[in-house]
Amino acid sequence: METFNSLFMVSPLLLGVLFFVAMLAGFIDSIAGGGGLLTIPALMAAGMSPANALATNKLQACGGSISATIYFIRRKVVSLSDQKLNIAMTFVGSMSGALLVQYVQADVLRQILPILVICIGLYFLLMPKLGEEDRQRRMYGLPFALVAGGCVGFYDGFFGPADGFFGPAAGSFYALAFVTLCGFNLAKATAHAKLLNATSNIGGLLLFILGGKVIWATGFVMLVGQFLGARMGSRLVLSKGQKLIRPMIVIVSAVMSAKLLYDSHGQEILHWLGMN
């Protein structure tokens, strides 16, 4: 396992760059998700192996999701006592997914992911009134916990340790569940999504710690950046609400879809464009 001595293997300038990348990622992630699109490439550009980059990314991502969660709890938007079942099911789901992915070939599922992310973006794009205000709740208790916590948590855990960028749009899935099934407005749904994001991030981090791949010192520097960026983004979630969150989710979904499509079919796309 890497020690805090790894801090001295990275130049102060590079650490500063990673800190600000993490701050920007935390800001974006707290509003619409997708921060890993910035942090994973930055960590790999800094010279980390893919395994170390994914593990360290999970550490720093915990800073952002925990920061946002703390802010929303203090503002009394989220009540931990009301979310105990959702937290438990998310943790169980994320750990189950992370364990299962070690024994299952996920190639077919990866082909479906861009379509899922595109559908999320289109759904928010074509439903301008979605999450504008609270609506009647459709699902309660254990059924909701199984869907929002168990299923999305499993999805997040299944793809998270394997690919780094995944589960792509997990935060958007959480938010969508709170909007469509709980009837929350989009700001309130995003706040609750951060709580479940934090839960699945912690579950994923525990597995990476057991694997001994986390670069702790660099990860903690980025964690501080994530914490600060997420705090700023969380304030905007409550002050701007649906008017900010909806277009951000659409943009992040579009960028993430393009990234997923390129990862899966990059050579074919370049050949079709006559660039290869």
Regions found by a protein language model. Give the residues of each.
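Structural signature of hydrophobic alpha-helical transmembrane segments
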Residues: L14, M48-G63, L109-V117, F154-G157, ...
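Residues within membrane-spanning alpha-helices of integral membrane proteins
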Residues: L15, K58, L113-V117, G121, ...
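Membrane-interface alpha-helices at helix entry/exit sites of multi-pass transporters
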Residues: M48-N57, L80-L85, G183-K194
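Cytoplasmic-side transmembrane-helix entry/capping segments in multi-pass membrane proteins
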Residues: L80-M89, L113, R135-P143, T190-L196, ...
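Selective hydrophobic functional segments
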Residues: A55-V108, N201-I251
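Transmembrane helix exit motif
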Residues: E2, I66-V77, P114-R138, V255-W272
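Selected transmembrane alpha-helices and immediately adjacent juxtamembrane segments
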Residues: E2-S49, D134-T190, M275-N276
